[in-house]
């Protein structure tokens, strides 16, 4: 884990890696290439039980109170395991909401895994319709 700075970060990476191996085996990855995955995916509750959805969020909203570095470690392990599904975009959405307002009430459902977040990047591009 190149971004793990402390031994706790290495422990976190090891824990997430073990979770990924256990709940997202290669058969799940191959199946996800051929068929749509369940929503939420089968690993969603296991990730919630481990506190991963809210790892980077304030304890005030049910998160673990860690930061973006710890989230990056989790995302790196999910990426290394090629975990399909909405975990990464949901984590990014919750980080964006939290950056704007760390006590936003929507974060409670995201931290617990009861909700799945998404985000869209606004390019600032606009259009004007002409005609009917």
Question: What are these model-derived regions, one by one?
Answer:
Residues 32-34, 95, 128:
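Juxtamembrane/interface motifs at transmembrane-helix termini
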């Amino acid at each position: 884990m190149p971004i793990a700075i402390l031994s706790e970060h290495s422990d976190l990476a090891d824990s997430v890696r073990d979770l990924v191996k256990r709940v997202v085996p290669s058969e799940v990855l191959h199946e996800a290439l051929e068929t749509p995955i369940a929503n939420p995916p089968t690993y969603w509750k296991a990730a919630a039980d481990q506190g991963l959805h809210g790892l980077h969020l304030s304890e005030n909203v049910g998160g673990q109170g860690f930061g973006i570095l710890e989230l990056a470690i989790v995302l790196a392990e999910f990426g290394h395991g090629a975990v399909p599904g909405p975990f990464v975009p949901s984590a990014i959405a919750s980080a964006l909401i939290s950056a704007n307002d760390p006590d936003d009430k929507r974060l409670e459902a995201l931290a617990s895994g009861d909700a799945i977040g998404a985000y869209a990047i606004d390019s600032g591009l606009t259009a004007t319709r002409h005609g009917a």
